[in-house]
Amino acid sequence: MSRVAKMPVAIPEGVEIAIKDTQINVKGALGALALAQNAHVVIASNDGKLTFVPANDSRQANAMSGTMRQLVNNMVVGVTKGFQKKLNLVGVGFKAQAQGDKLNLTVGYSHPVVMAMPAGITVATPTPTEVVIKGSDRQRVGQIAAEVRAVRPPEPYKGKGIRYSDEKITIKETKKK
């Protein structure tokens, strides 16, 4: 059995989990999330904890039990605390502006880049060079953050561009004559 799947998922107060034959629904203070259930994993609920057991002894069932456990745990954390990604804009004249569900980026192009945020994702700009993306779905928060970063990824010679706040950019040395 997978090491990750051996750990049960604790269900905190205010979180409702409904396990149907094809879907797992998690509802909490920050919203509701759904996940398709895998046929290789048996999910049992007892005493406020969820346990994940492989349905058979195959390698795929063993691997999927750990994967399903972690996905459900991310859903529980998402509907209670939520997830966030911080991005920094580095460069002269680079700035961001949040306008409702849109993010307006001025990052050195001849035109501003306007990105619409999907439902369930909120964007904030505490400073003009900082963007905070929040939501209850970890995968969507990471995907939107990656799409914002892809507008102007950091370049290796000066480090200008949009980067994650915890990202380290190694600066290359320029060509010498």
UniProtKB/Swiss-Prot annotation:
Mitochondrion keyword on record: no
Alphabetical keyword list: Ribonucleoprotein, Ribosomal protein, RNA-binding, rRNA-binding
GO cellular component terms, semicolon-separated: cytosolic large ribosomal subunit
PROSITE patterns attached to this UniProt entry: RIBOSOMAL_L6_1
GO molecular function (one): structural constituent of ribosome
Record's keyword annotation contains RNA-binding: yes
InterPro entries listed in its UniProt record: Ribosomal_uL6-like, Ribosomal_uL6-like_a/b-dom_sf, Ribosomal_uL6_a/b-dom, Ribosomal_uL6_bac-type, Ribosomal_uL6_CS
GO biological process: cytoplasmic translation
NCBIfam families in the cross-refs: L6_bact
Similarity remark: Belongs to the universal ribosomal protein uL6 family.
Protein's job: This protein binds to the 23S rRNA, and is important in its secondary structure. It is located near the subunit interface in the base of the L7/L12 stalk, and near the tRNA binding site of the peptidyltransferase center.
Complex formation: Part of the 50S ribosomal subunit.
Listed name of the protein: Large ribosomal subunit protein uL6
Gene that this sequence comes from: rplF
